[in-house]
């Protein structure tokens, strides 16, 4: 990307891993908390990286950024997570320049989501953009790229039906409960964790189960109380967790902690219990599988569920791809203009210097020289010359490099390459 005069880093990379090759455990090793994202960005800045975005969801962790070599970004990820380079190499992907651009469009528009048409990732991209911008880590390229991805995402939402129907991890969990549990409205349901996934799950539970026995527990009680107040639900203290699990028929875990919050010891083994773990890393310990009366389902299983809604969405993929191609092509055309932006800027400066020298010469020769009119006329001439050069460079992409070289040679624009 050095030809585009955008970053000190030679190339634009996407490095990351997703549900496609990395299971929940490995994704958990590479998941980033809000604090670790911040520390990663601060280190990137210290190391001279001038353009970088970081996202981490239950389905993927990715870094988009400029670097001399992708290992700069891989090293940052491994240093701020529990993952190793060896683990990363087995399941990861690395995309460079145009491929990296294509990938972020695919991800940001929901076509690469574990549940087709789930647009949660676009909000994560927006948050990542704001976080990086606050640290001065968003260059012109990243700003334009993220805005283009947001534009494509909006158009796909508005012009296709790829996101119609309730389909998300939170909805899939409720759908699973409805399919596998009889008389759901009579069961005691405990929701542990009231972050974004927890809130969405709570709304879907209330809407689809008609259950009046839903209890919320969160480490920070006031968060649970705000949600409970909206739906008239019960809130219990975190200290009551074990007792509430014992009273429950269904336990939904959406705590988002870095280590398991539910272990075998917390569960009463003689009662049937369905546990849905919606967290990455896994928040329910694997030893829970040893309990005969307990059925543990992780979000990866829920995300694989297909229903009529998902099948219906697939027919809109070609239309969505057309929109992406259109917006991505527009972005790439803008990117090509970055190639000649420094030359155009240097040419304008050169013409202005030539103009000033000539006006000074004429001013000395002509006694009644009209400075104001001369400035207006000469500036308009420069403007027209610049427009012709710019139009030529935009219109003939195949010979852009040769044209730039000729302009730089004719007008002696040595500063462009400095």
Swiss-Prot record:
It comes from the Bacteria. The active site is at residue 58. SUPFAM superfamilies: Glutamyl tRNA-reductase catalytic, N-terminal domain, Glutamyl tRNA-reductase dimerization domain, NAD(P)-binding Rossmann-fold domains. Signal peptide: none annotated. One of its GO terms (biological process) is protoporphyrinogen IX biosynthetic process from glutamate. NADP(+) binds at residues 193-198. Keywords: NADP, Oxidoreductase, Porphyrin biosynthesis. One of its GO terms (molecular function) is NADP binding. InterPro entries: 4pyrrol_synth_GluRdtase, 4pyrrol_synth_GluRdtase_dimer, 4pyrrol_synth_GluRdtase_N, GluRdtase_CS, GluRdtase_dimer_dom_sf, GluRdtase_N_sf, NAD(P)-bd_dom_sf, Shikm_DH/Glu-tRNA_Rdtase. Pfam families: GlutR_dimer, GlutR_N, Shikimate_DH. It catalyses: (S)-4-amino-5-oxopentanoate + tRNA(Glu) + NADP(+) = L-glutamyl-tRNA(Glu) + NADPH + H(+). Gene3D superfamilies: Glutamyl-tRNA reductase, N-terminal domain, NAD(P)-binding Rossmann-like Domain. Belongs to the glutamyl-tRNA reductase family. Catalyzes the NADPH-dependent reduction of glutamyl-tRNA(Glu) to glutamate 1-semialdehyde (GSA). During catalysis, the active site Cys acts as a nucleophile attacking the alpha-carbonyl group of tRNA-bound glutamate with the formation of a thioester intermediate between enzyme and glutamate, and the concomitant release of tRNA(Glu). The thioester intermediate is finally reduced by direct hydride transfer from NADPH, to form the product GSA. This is Glutamyl-tRNA reductase. It comes from Christiangramia forsetii (strain DSM 17595 / CGMCC 1.15422 / KT0803) (Gramella forsetii).
